[in-house]
Curated annotation (Swiss-Prot):
Species whose genome carries this gene: Mus musculus
Family the entry assigns: Belongs to the G-protein coupled receptor 1 family.
Protein name as it appears in the record: G-protein coupled receptor 183
Residues the record lists as binding 7alpha,25-dihydroxycholesterol: 83, 108, 112, 256
Entry's Gene Ontology BP terms: adaptive immune response; cell chemotaxis; dendritic cell chemotaxis; dendritic cell homeostasis; G protein-coupled receptor signaling pathway; humoral immune response; leukocyte chemotaxis; mature B cell differentiation involved in immune response
Residues on Extracellular side: 1-27, 92-101, 165-188, 262-283
Keyword Zinc-finger: no
Positions of transmembrane segments: 28-53, 74-91, 102-123, 146-164, 189-211, 238-261, 284-308
């Protein structure tokens, strides 16, 4: 089984470099991880979308960016069942290259649409807190709609070429899908991926850190000028939310992009084939860091829950209503059940009495 996966690059050098030697472990852990992501991500984001839609009359720029982020996460979860099956089968894609390409498209759309909308949210909050007078123009819903449309167009323009690129590859008796070794022969691959990391990670995280650092400075200045603000705990809650957003972003997106950047630099510094051990380590790191990055779609609803008072109140109200309906249904069904049992008992007694006569 270990020899089922050998890449052409390794074979040409006479080495049996199995980049999927970890498949026996991965076929258990990765489906489990993505099943949790699918359930939590789908339920959490659908709940967030329901709350946003119910409050559409009060929608503003922040809510609109959040809604687009939620839609991006829901779109991603729809592609997860096929990936779960792929990993459970030990990196074997059995439903054709066309669906593999569509899955890759959805994956990258979610990744970079999510990053872009998180960046939009940080800029939106920056103007709301640091430059409130300018924010009056930016918070206009028409302006925010234009920004959201631009983000989707940009992301689709960046990712649509994936539909024209073969994503699957025969490896022994299996077919891999959306794996890095499938693209190793692409011309100028290191430069392409380094450019993608620059635009899709380095630039957004720089903007996010700058915006939130300025917001923190403004909150500290406000607290010094007005002690009542500090006592109310509003600033502390805002700072905790900012820290949560930054920590989630760094934990989810940094490992993947750092792994890509360092490996591409190695390839540029050593144009020849890298050692099998280095390539296998990179392949394992990709699987681990991609799992971590995809977990971000589960974290977004929790950020809304703790950050947005209105969202938290709405969710709790919906849950209480659901529990209340369940309890009342159970209470109503209990007398009906007892009544039915009594009727059946009476009928049996009557039947026996009739037979006795």
């Amino acid at each position: 089984m270990a020899n089922n996966f050998t890449t052409p690059l390794a074979t040409s050098h006479g080495n049996n470099c199995d980049l999927y030697a970890h498949h026996s472990t991965a076929r258990v852990l990765m489906p489990l991880h993505y099943s949790l992501v699918f359930i939590i991500g789908l339920v959490g984001n659908l709940l967030a979308l329901v709350v946003i839609v119910q409050n559409r009359k009060k929608i503003n720029s922040t809510t609109l960016y959040s809604m687009n982020l939620v839609i991006s996460d829901i779109l991603f979860t729809t592609a997860l069942p096929t990936r779960i099956a792929y990993y459970a089968l030990g990196f074997d894609w059995r439903i054709g290259d066309a669906l593999c390409r569509v899955t890759a498209l959805v994956f990258y759309i979610n990744t970079y649409a999510g990053v872009n909308f998180m960046t939009c949210l940080s800029i939106d909050r920056f103007f709301a807190v640091v430059h409130p007078l300018r924010y009056n123009k930016i918070k206009r819903i028409e302006y925010a709609k234009g920004v959201c449309l631009s983000v989707w167009i940009l992301v689709f323009a960046q990712t649509l070429p994936l539909l024209l690129t073969p994503m699957s590859k025969e490896e022994g008796d299996k077919t891999t899908c959306m794996e890095y070794p499938n693209f190793e022969g692409t011309a100028s691959l290191p430069w392409i991926l380094l450019g993608a990391c620059l635009l899709g990670y380095v630039l957004p995280i720089t903007v996010i850190l700058l915006c939130y650092s300025q917001i923190c400075c403004k909150l500290f200045r406000t607290a010094k000028q007005n002690p009542l603000t500090e006592k109310s705990g509003v600033n502390k809650k805002a700072l905790n939310t900012i820290i949560l957003i930054i920590v989630v972003f760094i934990l989810c997106f940094t490992p993947y992009h750092v792994a890509i950047i360092q490996h591409m630099i190695k390839m540029l510094c050593s144009p020849g084939a890298l050692e099998c051990g280095a390539r296998h380590s990179f392949q394992i790191s990709l699987h681990f860091t991609v799992c971590l990055m995809n977990f971000n779609c589960c974290m977004d609803p929790f950020i809304y829950f703790f950050a947005c008072k209105g969202y938290k109140r709405k969710v709790m109200k919906m849950l209480k209503r659901q529990v209340s309906v369940s309890i009342s249904s159970a209470v109503r069904s209990a007398p009906e059940e007892n009544s039915r049992e009594m009727t059946e008992s009476q009928m049996m007694i009557h039947s026996k009495a009739s037979n006795g006569r």
